[in-house]
């Protein structure tokens, strides 16, 4: 007994000392404090999940510390709001480490409390010392991760059809355009926290309509004809908006899961506007739908083996999806398994899928200028995968900077190296330029031909236009307000020149103390204006700033009380034709 008491005393002293030691290293949540893990990465990875509001069953584990039903429910909500993005829905690990009970029970409550409170050099946020969690919440989470992970409900055809609504049947819709808007130059702007998109006339800068959608719309996509606008919220709700109506508005909607990010529509000749596809984070699957009603037709699971270790993964999330222009295929990128699926929709009853092994943690990407090659960031692998959609094979895996996040990227002709595609990064200040012409510039193809140095990490989107001589790079997740509130502009005719900084948030003229993060440059159809969202919290003022691309001067500011948390925006023509 004395020996046992001595060991317990030694363990207690060690645990008591650990917070002090870790706290010294990590209390200041800076890039240096986490050995290269930037605040931008933490902000990006620790995002909330709509699964926080879903009811789930509590399995009692007799080996775990006790929790009441109320405590379990509260902890589950915290987990899905702050932790699931890194550690996975089932706690099997995603971009973060697994938190399964075979690991957490061995660690014990006291160890886990220290780990949660003070973080880790690998990138775990210091939840308590940063003020994000109270000591009581840290104790709650330390006990929660020792319980069996609750499983969210599946979402099959029955559940989808229960949410499917055709608000205006196709036969009752206009047979011609019933408004005077220049549809090609309409912008669909996400109003993140209000669950809406603003349709804005790019010619007059007036709001056409505020359309109710799912929560935190991730992207807007256009049908091949340019008539229908598809938007998908993080809560997996898709809205179909008819731009031909006198006042463009919803004509159909559906939920395709519990959490999602991606939607697109068929573009191949003979299949224009016929099908839509959407992929979900949970359940891990994609669904093919009727293009003008959103009727669900076929659901395909993405659960399977990882591309590297060939281990089974129970929740590989569907990230970006794009439609090829010259044949009936969707390119579906599966995050955790690292697989790129070429889904041939010419006969969905006998579906043919080509599986291409790439790299784990696939996320977003875009076409090269020829629209033959699709480039997609494998963000936590620090790579860009290149798919040859003509030959249906992987063309290359390109090593880039830390956590590439291109949005759709940017295409332009480099003065020395020919056609390139560019991506910014969340984890560092670099902008990678990748050669994309294997025929006329073979030596530069699928290599980083130049790294530009931007303002800093925390970049989400990068953009240019065939008629522009500038490249715009945002940094909304950078911890330095001067950087997050401005954009870097590179001269494409002289890439050795230092970038120019445009003080977009300052130009917006917002008087309150909102964050004023500047996000997602987007050109108008003509390619002579660039739009930026100045994004603050929903109880603060936000705005859209329009810049003259030729002069790099302020052109106009769009302000309206209805512009609540504007983030991404998508010009109809450029989105329809994949111009970026």
What do these predicted ranges mean?
Residues 165-181, 221-224, 263-272, 311-326, ...:
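Structural signature of eukaryotic scaffold interfaces centered on beta-propeller domains
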Residues 36-78, 172-175:
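Electrostatic cytochrome c docking/interface patches
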Residues 418-423, 429-431, 456-540:
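Loop/turn-rich, solvent-exposed surfaces of beta-rich toroidal or solenoidal domains
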Residues 255-329, 333-336, 349-357, 362:
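Asp-box/WD-like beta-propeller blade repeats and closely related beta-sheet repeat scaffolds
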Residues 28-46, 90, 94, 100-151:
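Extracytoplasmic electron-transfer domains, predominantly the class I c-type cytochrome c fold
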Residues 68-89, 111-118:
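Sequence/structural segment immediately N-terminal to covalent heme-attachment motifs in c-type
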């Amino acid at each position: 007994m004395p020996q046992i008491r001595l060991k317990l005393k030694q363990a207690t002293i060690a645990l008591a000392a650990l917070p002090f030691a870790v706290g010294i290293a990590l209390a200041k949540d800076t890039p240096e404090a986490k050995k290269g893990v930037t605040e931008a990465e933490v902000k990006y990875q620790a995002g909330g999940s709509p699964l926080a509001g879903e009811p789930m069953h509590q399995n009692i584990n007799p080996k775990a510390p006790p929790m009441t039903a109320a405590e379990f429910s509260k902890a589950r909500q915290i987990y899905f709001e702050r932790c699931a993005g890194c550690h996975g829905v089932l706690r099997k690990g995603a971009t973060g480490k697994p938190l399964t009970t075979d690991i957490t029970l061995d660690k014990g409550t006291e160890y886990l409390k220290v780990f949660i409170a003070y973080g880790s050099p690998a990138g775990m946020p210091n939840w308590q010392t940063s003020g994000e969690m109270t000591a009581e919440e840290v104790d709650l989470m330390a006990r929660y991760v020792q319980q069996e992970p609750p499983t969210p409900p599946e979402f099959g055809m029955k559940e989808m059809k229960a949410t499917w609504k055709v608000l205006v049947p196709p036969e009752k819709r206009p047979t011609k355009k019933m408004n005077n808007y220049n549809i090609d130059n309409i912008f669909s702007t996400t109003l993140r926290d209000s669950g809406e998109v603003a349709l804005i006339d790019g010619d007059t800068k007036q709001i056409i309509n505020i359309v109710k959608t799912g929560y935190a719309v991730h992207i807007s996509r256009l049908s091949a004809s340019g008539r229908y606008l598809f938007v998908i919220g993080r809560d997996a709700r898709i809205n179909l908006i008819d731009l031909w109506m006198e006042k463009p508005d919803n004509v159909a909607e559906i939920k395709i899961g519990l959490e999602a990010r991606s939607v697109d529509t068929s573009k191949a000749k003979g299949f224009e506007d016929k099908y839509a596809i959407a992929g979900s984070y949970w359940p891990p699957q994609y669904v093919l739908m009727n293009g003008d009603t959103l009727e669900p037709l076929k659901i395909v699971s993405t659960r399977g083996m990882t591309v590297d270790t060939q281990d089974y993964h129970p929740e590989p999330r569907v990230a970006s999806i794009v439609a090829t222009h010259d044949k009936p295929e969707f390119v579906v990128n599966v995050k955790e398994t690292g697989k790129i699926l070429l889904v041939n929709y010419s006969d969905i009853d006998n579906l043919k899928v080509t599986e291409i092994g790439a790299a784990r943690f696939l996320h977003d990407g875009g076409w090269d200028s020829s629209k033959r090659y699709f480039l997609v960031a494998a963000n936590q692998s620090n790579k860009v995968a290149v798919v040859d959609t003509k030959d249906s094979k992987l063309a290359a895996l390109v090593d880039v900077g830390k956590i590439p996040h291109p949005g759709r990227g940017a295409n332009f002709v480099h003065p020395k190296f020919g056609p390139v595609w560019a991506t910014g990064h969340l984890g560092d200040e670099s902008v990678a330029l990748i050669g994309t012409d294997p025929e006329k510039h073979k030596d530069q193809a699928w290599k980083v031909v130049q790294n530009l140095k931007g303002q800093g990490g925390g970049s989400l989107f990068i953009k240019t236009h065939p008629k522009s001589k500038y490249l715009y790079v945002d940094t909304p997740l950078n911890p330095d307000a001067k950087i997050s509130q401005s954009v870097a502009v590179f001269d494409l005719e002289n890439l050795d020149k230092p970038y120019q900084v445009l003080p977009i948030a300052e130009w917006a003229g917002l008087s309150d103390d909102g964050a004023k993060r500047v996000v997602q440059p987007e050109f108008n159809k003509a390619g002579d204006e660039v739009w930026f969202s100045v994004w603050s919290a929903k109880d603060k003022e936000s705005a859209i700033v329009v810049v003259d691309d030729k002069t790099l001067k302020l052109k106009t500011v769009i302000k309206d009380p209805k512009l609540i948390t504007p983030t991404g925006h998508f010009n109809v023509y450029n989105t329809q034709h994949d111009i970026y």
